[in-house]
Structures are given as structure tokens and as C-alpha cells.
Amino acid sequence: MAIQTSNLGYPRIGLQREWKKTLEAFWSNKINEEQFLTTMKEIRLQHVKVQQEKGIELIPIGDFTYYDHVLDTAYMLGFIPSRFSEFTSYLDVYFAMARGSKDHVASEMTKWFNTNYHYIVPEYEEGLQISLKDNRPLRLYEEAKQELGVDGKPVILGPYTFLKLAKGYTQEQFATILKQLVAPYVQLLSELHAAGAQIIQVDEPIFASLTKEEVQQAKEIYEAIRKEVPNATLLLQTYFDSVEENYEEIITFPVSSIGLDFVHGKEGNLNAVSKYGFPADKTLAVGCIDGRNIWRADLDEVLTLFTTLQKQVQTKDLIVQPSCSLLHTPIDKTEETHLSTELFDALAFANQKLEELVLIHSALTQGTESISNELETYRNVHHTIRSSAARNREDVKAARTALKEEDFSRPLPFEKRYELQQVALKLPLLPTTTIGSFPQTTEVRQTRKEWRNGIISNEQYEQFIEKETEKWIRYQEEIGLDVLVHGEFERTDMVEYFGERLAGFSFTKNGWVQSYGSRCVKPPVIYGDVAFINGMTIKETVYAQSLTEKVVKGMLTGPVTILNWSFVRNDIPRKEVSYQIALALRHEIELLESSGIRVIQVDEPALREGMPLKEKDWDAYITWAVQSFLLATSSVANETQIHTHMCYSNFEDIVDAIRALDADVISIETSRSHGEFIDTLKHTTYEKGIGLGVYDIHSPRVPSKDEMYKIVEQSLQVCDPKYFWINPDCGLKTRRTEEVIPALEHMVQAAKDARSLLKTNA
């Protein structure tokens, strides 16, 4: 049996974020197109070289991109919306689709399955000419071969996943458009095969959540492609979950190899292999190293997995690979020497994961004795962090054990609470507020940097934050907002800020991952038991409240969002980590309330995106996610108003969960898809406080009062005015002051006009 090492995809951003810097330099005209292309080629080839040096045999080619791999596929297949027709050059069209321009709205962006990466949504239009516009995978395959002598493994997004992720067609059109994709995919694969590609990876992550009818439809497309390209060696790659429900059919697809995720879909895929075996004439590609987290693998567990598989399958060959692309992990841990030894040793970023694949390959081909020293090291590392004081806090254990049913619910139902809150807060009909943050100007960022570098003292920094807070409290009063915020000038990031103030978190210096386009994030590492230390938001919020007679909201990030936007320890269930965060936040909320703060917002923008891919697994996730929010927020008095904020994503999927959160008011980011959301509310009632974003904060445009009034008017057709709030769709941190003030003035005027109309019609 031949066994090879393979990688599914490598991080794009560069060890020092060279990729990001090159992109942004090009966008700001600091480098020209030739310099941009030359630098990008250097980065791309360097990534191939690293994987070659690490000992990976099947090196992915074509996973590199200038923005997003789904956008690459859309451009390649001619899915270019007509509004971009005036652009002529490849890069102009490509980046206009990704980012928009002064006169062109960008294509929509959304989360890549249940990860924290975002892709550009392909758009189908009537009359679209689907064809192979550009065989980019072929160019990159030939480049690696000529420049480095690497016979790589081209990686392409499969036709079924691509079209399922696209928008702009009706369900009735889907089958017809899918058939139109056969010809360009045939041409793409034929040209790759003719150029010498030994194996071509076709990614179909959507296969983890298809119906039986959809799998059959996908199979017919692959049969049509295979008929035209009979000799190409295709690896059908699935990831992010198991394909258990459709495994029996998927293993009959006309492909040479099938890749399965034995990390996030381990139980389901093992069950399926045990029940149905695996075809002897196909290669099984085993996703055995977690491509979505940063922890060293348990090599003993991985080798046990292979022992199990080798007993159950008769396949001629095996491939050892990560569970998914390493796009979701930082590149290399070597710079993280500031971390404690026990934590540093327990980490494995992308380059370390490649080394783990090679170790497993050695054990499988030469016996475990060939890596006996490494196995012993790994066992010691796991034992050290498992038994560390950080992971075994008695106070955290005791708090969890002491939880009772009443800790997860408010004393009174919403209607009665809301009445008490109206009396206590004295807010008008259709109250106005913002989501939390105000512009983080160059001065704000520079002052924070000087403070962190020790150039200015704590006292000087605090005085600066107070000055900014007072300035924006006055702005809000002048604008006429009803519920104010302190502005969050002390915060760099809504998760990092809290992680820095809670026990159990650590932070990397260079642990960057791509979020979307050139935007990179550095997720906190939850490595130990999470616990409250000291007040995190009290000082700034209480100071802001002291400046005004109006109500000031406390602002916190919710437990599920902190969890979903961090790298999370993998030795206990995510539910338990979420409860630990919730208990810490509960303490903070109680402190805010006892300090006189009567409205407290606990944001959960990432609640939906943490949901499992399979609908059958949703209930279990939603149950503990909702319980986490309730645990954090349920100890306050009935008169204290709890708000939450969410980013809109398939509201219908989670409307029951949103109700169960029992927040007094929810604000939802809907400005880009307001019509869809209004339609949803026509047949899905929501009977609690709700604010639908009345303008898009992601655009520098200042919308008119009339535009916002129209949205309020539409919203009031499906929302009870008694419970309706008026707000922007998200925080205003990234906007400029000269954009924010007029936009909020228009919003307040729209609210006043709406109140007048309601009074007239009463």
C-alpha cells in the first residue's frame, strides 16, 4: 500500500503578512500592477517551497488567491455581474467585484460554512455566458513546475459547491445552470491533465449537508464530466463534517480518490466506513490533523485512527492530510516565544501541522518505533498542559457545579419586564440608539499605541479616553439620541479586549489568520479555565453615565461570540468553555447594574455562524448557546434592560433561538438585505423589542433622512411600534466623524417623523 502526504491549502497571508501589505499598497497606488504581480508571485512560490521543504508530497496549487478562492472561481467561469462590464482589465474587474468602487456596489460577502473566513458570493444573472474565461489553475500549476520543479496538485472548487454558494437564480433554474457548468469544468480538467497534473483536488465541502436527491444530482454532473475527461485523476475532497448520511452513494462517484474529514466528522465518517467499507479501486485521503485549530495533534489517537481504518478498508493507497485547508490557522509558532513553555509546546500552527503529517507518514511506513522520541515528547506535552493549574481551577469547577435551573432565566416574562423598564427608563416611542462603538480615529489608535509602548503613562492614556468619551457623549446629546453609549475608545477588538481581562486567555504576537480580503485577525487563545478577575467595563461606562442625564448602555461581547472568535482548548466540550465565559460575564453585568447602569448590551454577532453544518445537530448547539447567554444575563433586576446585537444570517433558521435568548431588545444588521428580512417577519412574528438597522455602516455614504424613514416605515408594517427601536446596523468604529454625525442626525429626524405619523394615525 502506497501512503503519501498531502496538504489541502496553505495560509495566504505570508509569515509577516506580506500578502496583506502588498494588496493594500496596490489598492492605495503605492505600487503599480507589475510590482504587485511580481511580489504576489514571490509569496506564492515561497509558500510552495515551504511545503516542499517540510516534506509534503502532494502540494496544493491554486489555493493561493489575490482576495478569495470563491471569487477566483466566479471570475474563471464568467460569473461577472453586468454592473462591472465597464471595467476591462482582470484586476480592475476582480477587485471591483470584491470591494466595489465609487459607483459600483461590491458583491455580497458571507461566512465560509461555519468558519470565520468570508467568501465573495457568486452572482448569476439572466443571459450570463458561462465559459472558462481564464484557466488560472493551469497557469499556477505550470508556474510551480517551471520555477521550482514541483509537480503540484491543482486545487479547484467543485461545481456543485460553487453553484450552491451562488445567488441570483431560482430553484427551478439550478439544474439547468449546473449542466452549463459541465463544459467549462471539462475544459479546465482536460487542460490540467494534458499539462501533466497527476492528481486534481476538487473541493466539495457542501457534500456534508446535502439531501439524497442533491447527491444524486451531483453524481450525474460528475459522471458527465468523467465521460469527457476519462483519464484525469480526481480527488473528491469533503471537509468540515462527515458525509455519513450519503457516504454509500458518494463512494460510487466516478473519481479516483475521496477525501474525508476524520477530525470534525470523525464519528460519522468512521461509522460510514465501518458499515459500507471503502472501494478497493479508490484512494482514501484521511483528514487526520485539525486544520481549524492551533493545538498539537494527539499522535497516538491519530495512529489508532489509521489502525482502525486499515482493518476496515481494502483501498490500494492512503493519503495523510489535514482535515481542511490550513487557511484557518496561523503560519508558524516560532515567534511566540513570549508564551509560557507549557502553552508554546502545546501549539501547532500551519508549518507545525505539516511536520505532524510527515511524522504520521513515517510511523505508517516505517513503524511507530521510527518516531518513538517524538511520540514520547508529544505525550509529555499533552500531560503537562492537561494537568496545569490553568486548566484545573477549583473555583471555576465549584461555580459550574453550583449552577441551578433558576440561574438560566429572568424572574418575570418579557411583557411584564418591559412595562417596568418603560417606567424606569422613560424612553419615547421608537427610541433611538447606536450599536456601541464610535470612530477610532488615527489619534485614538496612535495614542493607544504610544500607551502600549510605554511612551505615555496610564494616567495620560486614561485622560485621553475620558476626553474622547465626553466629546462623544456631547455629540450624542446634541444629535438627540435616546440611549447613549460611551464609544469603546479603549477597545481594539470586541473579543480581544475581554480576553485580555479574563483568566484563561493568552495572545499570540503573530497568530494572524485571514478573515476576508486583506483583513486579518489575531484570535485569542483560550487555553485554560476562564474566570472573572476585575471589572472590565465599569470605569468607562460609569464615567460616561456621570456626564449625562440620559441613559448610557453598558457594552459587552457575549459568551458565544467570544468562544466562536477564539482558538479554543480542545480537552473539554465547547459548551463548558462557553459556560465559563458566561459566568465571568455574569459577574461583570452584576457590577454594571450595581453601579447604576440600567441598560446593558451583550452582543452575539457570532451566534449563528457557530452552528453545525448538519440540521440534525443544530438543536444541541442552540440549546447550550442560548443557555450561555441566559446564564450571563439572567441575574439582573426586571427593571434592567438587556439588549443584544446580531449580524443577519438566515433569521428563519434561528428565530426560535433568538426568542429563547429572552433579551429585552435585539438589534439586527439588516441594511444590505432589509427587503428579505421584512419578508421573513411577515410570516415569522417576533414579539419582543427589536431594532432593524436603518443604514449600512460599512459604506462611507451618508444616507438621507428619507431613505431611513422609508426603512422605518417598512419595518413598522411587520413590527409592533411599542417594541421597535431605531439604530444603525452595526458599530461605527470604522467610520469617520464627518460621516457619522450627519447620518445619526438623519436617523433621529427619521425617528421623529415616524413618531409624528404614529401619533397622527393613533
Swiss-Prot record:
- InterPro entries cross-referenced by the UniProt entry: Cbl-indep_Met_Synth_N (IPR013215), Cobalamin-indep_Met_synthase (IPR006276), Met_Synth_C/arc (IPR002629), UROD/MetE-like_sf (IPR038071)
Active site (record annotation)? H698
**Residue sites binding 5-methyltetrahydropteroyltri-L-glutamate per the record:** R17, E18, W19, K20, K111, R519, C520, W565, E609
Q: Which reaction does it catalyse?
A: 5-methyltetrahydropteroyltri-L-glutamate + L-homocysteine = tetrahydropteroyltri-L-glutamate + L-methionine
The residues that the entry says bind L-methionine are I435, G436, S437, E488, D603
Q: List all membrane-crossing ranges.
A: none
Q: Does the keyword Methyltransferase feature in the UniProt annotation?
A: yes
Q: What does this protein do?
A: Catalyzes the transfer of a methyl group from 5-methyltetrahydrofolate to homocysteine resulting in methionine formation.
What is the protein's name according to its record?
A: 5-methyltetrahydropteroyltriglutamate--homocysteine methyltransferase
Q: Which gene encodes it?
A: metE
